[in-house]
Amino acid sequence: MQKRDFDVNFKILDYELRIIFVHMIRIPTFTLWAFVIFAGGFCIASAGWNMSITWYIHQHGFHEADLFFSFYTQLAEWGIIVVAGGLAWAVSRRLCLFYGITAAVQGIVIWSLKQWFNAPRPATISAEQIRSIPGVDLQYWQSFPSGHTAIGLLCFGFMTVAITQLLRKNNKIIELCFLYLALAMGYSRMYLGQHNLLDVSVGGLVALTFLHTSLWLFNNWGSKVAKAQ
């Protein structure tokens, strides 16, 4: 009788722990280092190194990197958005809903900021320093902030969330790998001459704000649901 009660109680406890884990989502390594790096980039750009670092990254390239980054940057326009949504759906429809709403609202905010500031892009600031990269159509205005960097960090952040949920455990290596992919998206925008360091840094910080807020709301709502059950 005692063994049976123990088995029943253990199953109930295991079920409750799984509910709590699904609702209490945290990716501390990803968010911490993303903040440190993008905030650091913002400080460096604000200190007067914005275009000098941008030009250095843009002008020190080679053919293979040109091909890679010109392809990789396009993933922020469709590829990673779909993949992140699919992984979020695999965890739960609620997580996918949070992802979709967050991405949409962030997109509106980024678009509004671009329209408001209408900042010049590197090709407008100094056309003679721009090098030709096959397959890259340069843009000239609405530079601030970087939309590709923002959606890249948000999508890779939600991918990290989804995979840690599917694996039922946090993994620093996974978080760092996806953070590296997010940083590479921002780097590609400077490498291709489409954005400067300030654009990329602010784009990353905006996305990090939306990611953190979305996960906080998800966890807060989830805790209430778990308690109600």
Report the location of each language-model feature.
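N-terminal transmembrane-helix/juxtamembrane module of multi-pass inner/ER membrane proteins
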Residues: 6-80, 114-139
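Membrane-water interface of alpha-helical transmembrane segments
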Residues: 25-29, 67-70, 93, 97, ...
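Membrane-embedded catalytic cores of phosphoryl/pyrophosphoryl-handling enzymes
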Residues: 26, 132-229
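Aromatic-anchored segments of alpha-helical transmembrane domains
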Residues: 40-44, 105-112, 180-190
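Hydrophobic alpha-helical transmembrane segments
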Residues: 73-89, 151-156
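Interfacial segments of alpha-helical transmembrane regions
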Residues: 85-109
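Hydrophobic, lipid-facing residues on alpha-helical transmembrane segments of integral membrane proteins
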Residues: 100-112, 116, 205, 209, ...
